[in-house]
């Protein structure tokens, strides 16, 4: 008994000595502290905001394009990552938002209003697609959404009187905004959408409902959740994010052709979401930047023949060493 008492006293004294040393030690970076994460977040935003002052026009264009793509990736994170609905037709919604802004702006409508119409039309199409698609599962759902993407591409290609088809829409008026302003606008929009998705995922009851539907629809239905309505809302909101991506793309590039919104682009968005980590908005944001800037940077350096090879190699390496994607790595650092 005396030995046990003495060991407890020794342990207590050692713990007190350690605490005294820590109190006298200089400030240490706490990786798991909320304050440290806030500092890192503020620093990252400040670095992104300062990029136009550091890099040239080409790289700023690449970052803006990557930010626009990230909105389409966010739409997949909401639909597939949170709700568990596999979609290979997101490029169709992006094209709807883009061409709505392009056509209306060419007719003299204000670009902001035309972009809003593009988002609303994409949401309407997402709602209509969700009516039958919300009842499908697995590969049936994947094929159904892929069919929607192909149908949208064919409509954009063959509606020559409206979209000019393969000739493309040229000279879309956007008010003459300079690149630095575009960059800051895109960065602000992406951060707002990213913050909204992170809030839904981690803090809101809607995120809990979406995850319940993803994990077990029968249990969610037994809990009183209208699974069909939840899926329909997910389709609609996801289409709105994709439509916003398309509207901003049209306003920035000012040139549209249907080939920019074919099924290959849908697979590209899905690949970015997978590399970023399905269901991780932060990972999707990082993957969209990574998988846009590095291949395009190789093209700028004259290594265009190896661009797709490097792209595929990057994807395989990430999936091999990070099965949960970049988002999984971020989550491990948080814990």
Annotate each language-model stretch with its function.
Residues 5, 27-29:
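Aromatic (phenylalanine/tyrosine) cluster motif
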Residues 12, 33-35:
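Residue-identity detector for glycine
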Residues 35-335:
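Transmembrane alpha-helices and adjacent helix-loop boundaries
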């Amino acid at each position: 008994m005396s030995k046990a008492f003495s060991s407890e006293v020794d342990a207590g004294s050692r713990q007190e000595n350690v605490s005294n040393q820590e109190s006298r030690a200089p400030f240490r970076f706490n990786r798991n502290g909320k304050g440290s994460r806030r500092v890192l977040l503020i620093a990252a935003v400040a670095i992104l905001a300062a990029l136009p002052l550091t890099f040239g026009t080409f790289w700023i264009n690449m970052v803006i394009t990557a930010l626009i793509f990230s909105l389409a990736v966010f739409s997949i994170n909401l639909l597939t990552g949170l709700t568990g609905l596999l979609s290979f037709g997101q490029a169709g919604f992006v094209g709807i938002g883009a061409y709505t802004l392009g056509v209306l702006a060419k007719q003299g409508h204000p670009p902001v209003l035309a972009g809003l119409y593009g988002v609303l039309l994409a949401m309407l199409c997402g709602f209509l697609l969700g009516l039958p698609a919300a009842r499908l599962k697995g590969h049936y759902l994947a094929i159904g959404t892929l069919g929607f993407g192909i149908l949208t591409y064919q409509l954009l290609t063959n509606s020559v009187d409206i979209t000019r088809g393969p000739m493309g829409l040229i000279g879309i008026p956007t008010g003459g905004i300079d690149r630095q302003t575009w960059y800051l606008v895109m960065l602000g929009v992406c951060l707002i959408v990213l913050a909204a998705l992170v809030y839904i995922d981690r803090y809101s009851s809607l995120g809990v409902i979406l995850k319940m539907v993803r994990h077990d629809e029968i249990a969610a239905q037994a809990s009183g959740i209208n699974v069909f309505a939840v899926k329909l809302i997910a389709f609609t909101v996801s289409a709105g994010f994709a439509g916003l991506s398309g509207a901003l793309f049209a306003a920035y590039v000012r040139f549209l052709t249907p080939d920019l919104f074919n099924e290959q682009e849908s697979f590209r968005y899905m690949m970015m979401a997978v590399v970023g980590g399905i269901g991780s908005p932060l990972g999707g944001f990082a993957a969209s930047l990574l998988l846009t800037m590095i291949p395009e940077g190789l093209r700028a350096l004259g290594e265009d023949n190896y661009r797709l090879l490097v792209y595929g190699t990057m994807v395989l390496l990430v999936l091999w060493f990070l099965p949960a994607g970049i988002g999984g790595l971020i989550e491990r650092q948080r814990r």
